[in-house]
């Protein structure tokens, strides 16, 4: 198991990791406000706050994460909230291998892609594209340019040029927002034609 995966699993075993606020992302609330519910896939769902939020608003929500501790916490969070959401143990870069079946109307990745090594990023993008319905929204957020320490802990960043080149065959960039010094968020839309 890679060092970054060991560190993430250890963080969940020690309690709630610093990055887990337990609250849905405000941008997610804005993205789905006034929109008819559909199917949503949370890639790298962690403890499930976003999937639980979506399920509570009528969405059929599925979360996938490689950390068993995170999946267990997500299932508990859904049960405590009285909502039905599916949480699957698996690799976010290959959701179909974990039994996750699309198509989905909304995909989320809040803090997962920036930890995926370059060698697995093409597989991740292809997996996300394969799970997305034509016209689906994909909210991708994470660290744009990680400081040295974060790189040592497995953060690789999400640069605008990379998003255009890797995601471009499948998704259009509808919006990009820089948040603070290191964070970036992209609103991508799946092309109408199924590419790849």
For each feature predicted by the language model, list its residue ranges:
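Class I (Rossmann-like) S-adenosyl-L-methionine-dependent methyltransferase catalytic domain
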Residues: 1-43, 47-102, 116-131, 136-196
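Short catalytic micro-motifs in class I SAM-dependent methyltransferases
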Residues: 111-115
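A conserved beta-strand element that flanks and buttresses the S-adenosyl-L-methionine
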Residues: 108
